[in-house]
UniProtKB/Swiss-Prot annotation:
Listed name of the protein: NACHT and WD repeat domain-containing protein 2
PANTHER family to which the protein is assigned, alphabetical: BETA TRANSDUCIN-RELATED PROTEIN, NACHT AND WD REPEAT DOMAIN-CONTAINING PROTEIN 2
Encoding gene per record: Nwd2
Gene3D superfamilies to which the protein is assigned, alphabetical: P-loop containing nucleotide triphosphate hydrolases, YVTN repeat-like/Quinoprotein amine dehydrogenase
Keywords in alphabetical order: Leucine-rich repeat, Repeat, WD repeat
Entries under Pfam families matching the protein: AAA_16, Beta-prop_NWD2_C, HTH_NWD1
The organism of origin for this protein: Mus musculus
Annotated segments matching region Disordered: 1702-1721
Length: 1742
């Protein structure tokens, strides 16, 4: 629980004592189940199976799942019900084995359940007496004699009971009923089934009758005691009630419940056949009566025994009396009514008992060290319980542990082969060490014993975590204050040595490390450099290892030289093994006969390992004296014996169930709990098919618990329990068992994948919440139906089974179990899901579930960070990335690293921090959408601020790979279809394949010392072709890096011999190469690696290009000639010549879609040829560029072939191939030259590099705007290479460093609009979602609230100073420093009219949008009509900080010492308040909900409430002395009750204006701005970080929302730019922040006290951006300009309208209602329409 839930409740003394015992290693003081809160709630159901079937089925279907959910959510524990009768066949109810198992499990539940443990369901049926499974020989013979005496036939007993001399003493046992076929009451053949059952029914009834009569006779004769007779005369239910309730304390009985159902006058209905299952009957039809003897026993149990218990304790007992239907008896309807009531009462009782008895245990949740210690302690107790050998080794270890007076001490080493008992020996030592030391050093001593079974927990695999956990345990035990544990491994080792020296005579120390070979190689742990060879006097270290693993024993011998410090565990001799076996058998009252002993001795002569002895014991304990035993009865190796054990289990429980159960336990990362095993097997259709072989399945489809119990019993001691984080897991006791289970059950890949999928689905919660999983029954059940008379019924059955789906009752799997929805930080972590899900998803190939179920799941991220597992988060993301190669994961990991410190300190801020960083890039990284939506859904639980639009500049650095000391050594770079793999060629002849992310060299080829001229990959990346200075082409198999062939390129016979390969290219199946100054092109077959023929051209070849289909080759030559050849035949088709034939063909481009060829010559001229008729190409376009003095650097055809990018030294041109004209042209700045340019994959961006510039530039192709300029820290970029597979770019710098840039991320980074200047003011309309910003320039920018992009720019003549909007936002009035005012139509961008004449100090607009108030400092202020521009009145008084009252009657402002209310109709001062002499007004505000009350603060440090109506001070509040010295701002709540005052410090001052009390709330930093929400519930403020706070992230300030009701900060969000303006919207609590770079951030507040949780986040348009995949970049903004001509000129008291003004010219003295002229009526209409729209769209708001 976090952050301090556990701290709110002091731990009880028992817990503290348990904790102390665990930390000091006093294992005998720990309870058997170890987990402080109990391992689970386990409830045993005691009932007669016949009459409670419906109740138990209903409880299982509806009540148990709810109780399980309750326990998981509130206590982090499992709720398990043990009902062994459920799901098994009727003929097994009487089984002695089942009854024995029931009593054993009942005892377990009573001992180990953390809460309720026993529920009795008792009806009118007493139940059958039991058939004994085994009877001592003397007792059995006495019963036989008594039966003969009673004249009973005893042949049946003699036939069914067999004498067994292997029992001690000898006994008779009931033979197995193998001859009785398995059947079930639900079978589709009831009559046949009954016939099958009859013989056994009769036999069992007769056996019971004989036992009953004989035992009664013996009891009457005094030959048998009552306690003995009970075995034969009592029913199972009485035994269970007596055992559970008979001798218990009142405190214990609080955990038990009994439900008694009485049926009134049941005897009357005895003849109704269906009533036989509700009571005991005797006799045959028609003389059927209720069994009086059974009724007597029932009354004794129900009406005497239970009431006696109730009288002495608080046992809960509920009795209900049911009345039968007169005709039908105990009908279905009556039973259903009873069951409904029982279900409700059962649920309430269980909840009551759980809440009263189970403690919420958060210790292991918050304390990983405590959990680690408990895990090893529980393993230690388990292993010690299996220790059998009392050997000399134990005495040596005992002697070693005791303190010695002299001599130096070394660690002691125990070694031996597998299965020699090293772990059990060390566990026994660890268990006894505390007691030995305590006994030796006296009662006042307090020894410390630390035990670790290496490799069994996450913290005991690596040396670093092992040393850390041991050091932490030492520090706690020896009360050493360690400020922080070292990060470096050598420092950690030094700390470990120092802590060893803390031991003393009173506090000796023993450290036991089992299985050193299990340590990982990390930090060179296996070299044992960390192990101290010499120990302090009171320290003992005991180690164990295998002798031949990793050379550990050899290294130990180099470290510790004394032979006395080594104990070798060698196999025992045969005699000792026989002795041990004999003792083990006697403990369970068994032995072997002398004849059988021969075969035992024979087995022990082959193997005497302790584990073999134990496995042999498992086998021989089941031998019977009359059964034949031979050499094959016992295996002779451990391996074979384990296999034999598993096979015997398969016979008992079913092959599929055992193989899958053991398979799941083996493949689970940490093991499985018992309930998880049940759940997972229920989801496995192959297991359920086996279990439902002869029955029709029904809901819920589960594995009967009996099979799980048999499995556990059969593997007792081998499948052990281990406690991890409040959960008890089943794990293998040793690695040998695990290896054999793996070999037998986890070999087939298809099975493995299916099982991993089932486990992954389980931990994902795919089938939870009642979701039904399809189940198709296999043939055996249907085959059993073949003798049905009606064939159509069989078809119906088949159809039913094909369509059937069943609830498997899998539990929900949230990441955390929430105790209280209103306290989201109090929770139990679902550690099982945390540890298992990722493991199974990566092994079953469910990539989407891996991404969206874990990594992109906000709840997982938040929980992991909250519990301190930040580094594990990064490791898991890296694992998922390696598995899926999704670049979103890489970006998420770098994002998390950048906010590490912030979210570790304040995990609640995670959602806001992620949203700020992910929103700008989500259009380019679409898989992050899921995480953003998760943040929207779950983030507001922890942080109420939700960013709607983020303007954060995302930092990005490419992957870098140093290739050589200089770019001159790098010959070629090739990207591949794998985004992280590149091929590089160096001039020294080496070709390397690199993984750029890991900087790992994957493969390398050396080209035999020849210099590489170039290399190319075939389109399918099958072949790598390399050109060398030896004039050879080397063709390699790219996958295996092996040379396939080497082809020499030859020129013409008359050519000079010293020429090199000038160039080469690849087509689909061919390579084409040509030499310098050669007219021939050699064509090579790639598949066979030999030259086919040579193309002979007219002139020297300069470039070659092939068509996409690989049919034609185009050879460019000198004098601008191009010859076309057929690649298949070598035929020359034609030659074309450009008109500008002075130079040579430098580039050729083939446009397959348009059937065109483009020739670009050395001077940049370009010609386009139509190749539809390949034999006669036609010239269609010609561009003469010879006048330009700029050479062509590179050329590229866009992927869709719609544009050609031509990069020249001084310019970049984009040629539209549709119209063949230059679409865009970008010129380099003065003294700058382009080195290279390419198009992004989608063609939206141009990427270029400049000469001598260490940066990559990104331009938007449509606007020419520079989106980003990214610095390359490794030096000037000399080469750009674009990937044809991914939107990636490779750049090579002068220093020989290769960088890989992700263009998607860079495009997204630049997807933020900025005005370029600091935002000075933000204006929001009362309605609508548009934002207007002023930034000290001549523009007003109109922002789209939803997208955060600039929609329009309104240009003015001067710098814009003021801006106001009508309430709908349709009209905008602005003023600039050139004394002009403008009225704009915001939708069309039209400047409707312009007024000149006076510089405005403040603009106001009335609430009804009819009038504008233009306040001036130097001249008269004016009120004018917005629709016409006509003056209403002049205001002669200068006003500051003015407001218009809500009734639109007054404009209220202040002067130095007065508050004035001026009439909007006359301009005269109607009301005023004057301060006393020398006192000035500092600030004032209107109260929104009280429009006639004004609040102002004076220099006398008083806050005054002044009534405008009465012109009196209503209330005056005196502030503390010097309070206003640094007044920054103050806000008034809408109801006028609170005033919020900020003084530029770290305090928020909340003033209660009614009581005058001042409350100070500490803020997170120095407050810069504050704003009160419109409803007065929240205060939004921005504060700057304290200087002493050390955070690695670049946050400058924080945006914080405080809920005024409780003063709690409900949200905080870092701001990474300097804020310049803060605004809140009126309608919703939306926050808009303007920044110094001209960008804006938009946030909203979602407080959970809001009923609807502001669903607007998910539905808001800002979220539609990333739901709309097509929108990847910001749209172009519209630009609107001001009117040059002035429509109206203001003079001192008059207006002069221009002749062409849209406003009617009229005298100011005329009526205010002016009529517009006909000429300009349209403009007037537009203004009026804009004003009218408010009444159509919204309700009027005065």
């Amino acid at each position: 629980m976090w952050p301090a839930g556990a701290g709110t409740k002091l731990p009880c003394p028992r817990d503290s004592a348990l904790r102390r015992a665990a930390f000091s290693g006093n294992l005998t003081a720990l309870p058997s189940h170890l987990v402080p809160a109990g391992r689970s709630v386990r409830v045993f159901i005691s009932a007669n199976p016949e009459d409670t079937g419906a109740e138990r089925q209903a409880l299982r279907e509806t009540v148990y799942p709810k109780l399980r959910e309750f326990c998981r959510e509130n206590y982090g524990l499992e709720f398990q019900v043990i009902d062994l009768y459920w799901g098994i066949e009727e003929d097994e109810w009487d089984s002695p084995e089942l009854q024995k198992m029931r009593m054993k499990l009942l005892e377990e539940c009573l001992k180990t359940s953390a809460g309720p443990c026993f529920v009795g369901l008792l009806g009118e049926k007493y139940g059958n007496i039991r058939i004994p499974g085994e009877v001592e020989a003397s007792e059995f013979e006495m019963i036989l004699d008594a039966a003969v005496e009673a004249k009973l036939e005893t042949k049946l007993l003699e036939d069914w009971y067999c004498r067994d001399e292997n029992s001690v003493p000898a006994a008779y046992y009931l033979r197995p009923r193998l001859e009785v076929p398995r059947s079930n009451k639900n079978s589709t053949q009831p009559s046949a089934s009954s016939e099958q059952e009859r013989p056994w029914q009769e036999i069992s009834d007769e056996i019971k009758t004989i036992f009953k009569a004989a035992v009664k006779l013996l009891h009457e004769q005094g030959k048998m005691k009552q306690s003995q007779a009970k075995r034969y005369l009592f029913s199972a239910i009485e035994d269970e009630f007596d055992f559970a309730l008979g001798k218990q304390t009142p405190a214990f009985l609080k955990k038990c419940v009994c439900y008694i159902r009485k049926i009134a006058n049941i005897e009357r209905f005895v003849k109704i056949p269906e009533m036989g299952k509700y009571m005991d009957i005797t006799g045959t039809d028609p003389r059927i009566v209720r069994d009086p003897e059974a009724q007597e026993k029932l009354i004794k149990l129900r009406d005497e025994f239970i009431p006696t218990i109730v009288a002495s304790s608080n046992l809960r007992v509920y009795t209900s009396v049911t009345h039968c239907d007169m005709k039908l008896g105990y009908s279905q309807e009556i039973e259903n009514h009873y069951i409904e009531g029982l279900g409700k009462q059962f649920y309430e009782d269980m909840i009551d008992i759980i809440q009263a008895t189970v403690q919420q245990n958060f210790d292991t949740e918050t304390d990983t060290l405590y959990d680690e210690i408990l895990q090893h302690s529980s393993l230690c107790k388990t292993y010690a319980s299996f220790y059998e050998y009392k050997c000399e080794s134990l005495n040596i270890l005992h002697k070693y542990i005791l303190p010695s007076k002299t001599g130096h001490i070394n660690p002691l080493v125990v070694y031996g082969g597998p299965c020699t008992g090293k772990t059990l020996l060390l566990a026994e030592v660890a268990k006894k060490a505390y007691g030995w030391l305590h006994e030796d050093t006296g009662p006042d001593s307090d020894p410390v014993v630390i035990v670790r079974f290496l490799g069994t927990t996450d913290m005991s695999i690596d040396l670093r975590t092992l040393l850390l956990s041991v050091c932490e345990q030492l520090a706690v035990n020896y009360r050493c204050l360690v400020q922080s544990f070292p990060k470096k491994i050598h420092d950690l080792r030094d700390l470990f040595i120092n802590l060893l020296n803390e031991s003393s005579l009173q506090r000796p120390l023993v450290i036991i490390l089992d299985a050193l070979e299990q340590l990982s190689e990390a930090d060179e742990a296996r070299k044992l450099w960390w192990l101290p060879a010499h120990l302090p006097r009171f320290v003992r270290i005991i180690l164990s290892t295998l002798p031949n693993k990793h050379g550990i024993l050899q290294k130990l011998r180099c470290l510790i030289h004394e032979e006395d410090n080594y104990i070798e565990l060698i196999p025992r001799d045969r005699k000792m093994c026989s002795q041990v076996l004999k003792h083990q058998l006697l403990r369970v009252k068994r032995k072997v006969t002398s004849g059988q002993q021969i075969y035992v001795n024979n087995a022990f002569s082959k193997c005497t390992l302790p584990m073999f002895v134990n496995l042999t014991f498992r086998e021989v304990r089941h031998w019977r004296s009359h059964k034949d035993v031979d050499e094959s009865s016992l295996c002779v190796t451990v391996h074979e014996s384990i296999e034999q054990l598993f096979w015997s289990l398969e016979k008992k429980c079913g092959q599929k169930l055992v193989s899958r159960a053991l398979g799941y336990i083996t493949m689970a990362k940490m093991g499985l709990s018992e309930m998880e095993l049940e759940d997972v097997l229920a989801l496995d259709n192959s297991v359920m098919n086996e279990l439902n072989e002869n029955t029709r399945p029904s809901n819920p489809l589960r594995v009967p618990y009996l099979y799980i119990a048999r499995l556990k019993e059969g593997l007792n001691g081998y499948l052990i329990e281990r406690h991890v984080k409040n959960v008890t897991l089943l794990v293998w006791a040793n690695r040998h068992l695990q290896l054999i289970a793996q070999k037998l059950y986890l070999q087939e890949d298809s099975n493995l994948r299916e099982m991993h999928t089932i486990l992954a689905d389980y931990f994902l919660g795919v089938w939870s919440g009642g979701r039904r999983k399809a189940f198709c029954l296999e043939d055996p059940y249907l085959n059993g139906c073949l003798d049905l008379e009606n064939r159509s019924l069989l078809e119906e059955e088949k159809h039913f089974m094909e369509q059937a789906s069943f609830d498997r009752q899998a539990p929900d799997q949230p990441w955390v179990f929430q105790c209280n929805p209103l306290e989201p930080d109090i929770f139990f972590v679902n550690h099982r899901k945390m540890s298992e899900l990722l493991y199974h998803l990566t092994r079953c190939g469910k990539t989407d579930d891996l991404l969206y179920g874990i990594i992109m799941n906000f709840s997982w991220l938040y929980t992991m960070i909250k519990i301190g597992q930040f580094d594990k988060v990064l490791a898991d993301i890296e694992l998922a990335y390696n598995y899926s190669q999704e670049k979103e994961l890489k970006f998420l990991a770098s994002t998390l690293r950048s906010i590490r410190n912030k979210v570790i300190a304040f995990p609640g801020s995670l959602s806001a921090e992620l949203q700020q960083r992910l929103l700008p890039v989500v259009s380019s990284l679409p898989k992050l959408r899921h995480l953003l939506l998760e943040c929207d859904k779950d983030g507001p639980k922890y942080c109420s601020i939700v960013p709607l639009h983020s303007s954060m500049d995302v930092t990005y650095s490419p992957e870098r790979l140093p290739l050589a000391s200089s770019h001159l050594h790098v010959t070629e770079i090739l990207p591949t279809c794998n985004p992280s793999t590149v091929l590089t060629a160096l001039e020294n002849g080496s070709i390397s394949t690199w993984d750029v992310e890991t900087r790992q060299l994957l493969r390398q080829i050396t080209t035999a010392q020849s210099v590489i001229l170039g290399m190319k990959l075939s389109s399918d990346e099958k072949y790598l072709v390399v050109a060398t200075t030896n004039n050879t082409l080397l063709i390699y198999d790219n996958v295996n890096s092996c040379l396939l062939s080497e082809v020499e390129i030859k020129g013409t016979k008359h050519g000079s011999g010293s020429t090199y390969i000038n160039g080469f290219t690849l087509s689909v199946n061919h390579a084409l190469a040509w030499l310098e100054a050669s007219k021939d092109v050699t064509v090579i077959d790639l598949l066979y690696g030999w030259p086919l023929y040579q193309f002979h051209c007219w002139y020297e070849v300069t470039c070659v290009q092939c068509s996409l289909d690989g049919v034609y080759a185009f050879c460019g030559q000198y004098l601008n000639n191009t010859t076309i050849f057929h690649l298949g035949s070598g035929e020359k088709i034609c030659t074309v010549t450009s008109e500008f034939s002075g130079g040579f063909v430098k580039f050729l481009l083939i446009l397959d879609t348009a059937q065109e060829m483009v020739m670009v010559d050395s001077e940049g001229s370009l010609s386009v040829w139509n190749t539809e008729d390949i034999s006669n190409p036609q010239l269609t376009e010609d561009f003469d560029c010879r006048k330009e003095d700029s050479e062509v650097v590179s050329i590229e055809l866009s992927e869709d072939q719609s544009a050609i990018l031509i990069c020249k030294a001084l310019s970049i041109e984009l040629l539209d191939t549709g119209m063949w004209k230059v679409a865009e042209k970008f010129r380099a700045r003065h003294n700058e030259r382009f080195v290279s340019a390419v198009l992004s994959k989608n063609g939206d961006c141009i990427i270029a590099t400049m000469e001598n510039t260490p940066a990559v530039f990104f331009w938007r192709r449509d606007t020419g705007q520079c989106l980003a300029s990214l610095q390359e820290s490794s030096g000037t970029i000399v080469k750009l290479v674009k990937s044809s597979h991914h939107n990636m770019l490779l750049s090579l710098s002068t220093s020989g460093v290769l960088s890989i840039w992700d263009i998607d991320i860079i495009t997204a980074m630049s997807n933020i609009d900025k005005t370029g200047k600091p935002i000075q003011s933000l204006v929001l309309p009362a309605r609508g979602e548009i934002i207007y910003s002023l930034d000290g320039s001549d523009c007003v920018h109109k922002w789209n609230f939803s997208s955060g992009f600039i929609e329009a720019v309104f240009k003015h003549e001067g710098i814009v100073e003021h801006c106001v909007l009508t309430s709908t936002g349709d009209l905008m009035v602005t003023s600039d420093d050139k004394s002009s005012q403008y009225v704009w139509h915001t939708s069309s961008g039209e400047n409707l009219f312009r007024i000149n004449g006076q510089r405005i100090s403040q603009l106001l607009i009335t609430h009804n949008d009819q009038f504008v108030v233009s306040l001036c400092e130097e001249n008269a202020s004016r009120v004018w009509r917005l629709a016409t521009g006509h003056r209403v009145c002049n205001i002669l008084t200068t006003l500051q900080n003015a407001f218009i009252t809500s009734a639109n009657t007054f404009v209220v402002g202040m002067t130095k010492s007065k508050v004035l209310a001026v009439s909007l109709w006359t301009g005269s001062i109607t009301k005023k308040f004057c301060c006393e002499d020398g006192i000035t007004i500092v600030n004032f505000k209107l109260i929104p909900d009280c429009p006639d009350v004004i609040v102002f603060i004076t220099s006398a440090e008083t806050v005054n409430l002044w009534s405008l109506t009465d012109e009196v001070i209503c209330r005056r509040v005196q502030l503390p002395s010097n309070f206003l010295k640094n007044l920054e701002d103050f806000e008034i709540s809408p109801n006028g009750k609170l005033g919020i005052i900020s003084r530029g410090d770290e305090n928020i001052n909340v003033l209660d204006l009614h009581s005058g009390k001042l409350r100070v709330v500490h803020a997170s930093g120095v407050i810069w701005r504050q704003r009160l929400s419109r409803d007065g519930r929240y205060l939004v403020y921005i504060c700057f970080r304290n200087g002493e706070e050390e955070e690695e992230n670049d946050a400058i300030s924080s945006l914080i929302v405080m809920r005024l009701a409780d003063g709690k900060n409900i949200g905080a969000c870092s701001l990474y730019k300097t804020p310049t303006f803060l605004a809140l919207s009126q309608r919703h609590l939306n926050i808009i922040v303007g920044f110094d770079d001209g960008s804006i951030g938009i946030y909203t507040v979602v407080d959970r006290v809001d009923a609807a949780l502001k669903i607007k986040i998910a539905t808001s348009n800002s979220r539609q951006i990333f739901n709309n995949a097509t929108q990847t970049s910001r749209p172009k903004s519209n630009s609107y300009s001001f009117k040059v001509s002035v429509d109206c000129l203001w003079r001192e008291s008059t207006e002069v309208f221009a002749r062409d003004s849209p406003i009617t010219v009229s005298d100011s003295s005329e009526s205010n209602e002016a009529t517009p002229s006909k000429k300009h009526n349209s403009c007037y209409d537009r203004v009026c329409a804009a004003l009218e729209s408010r009444s159509h769209s919204y309700t009027p708001d005065n």
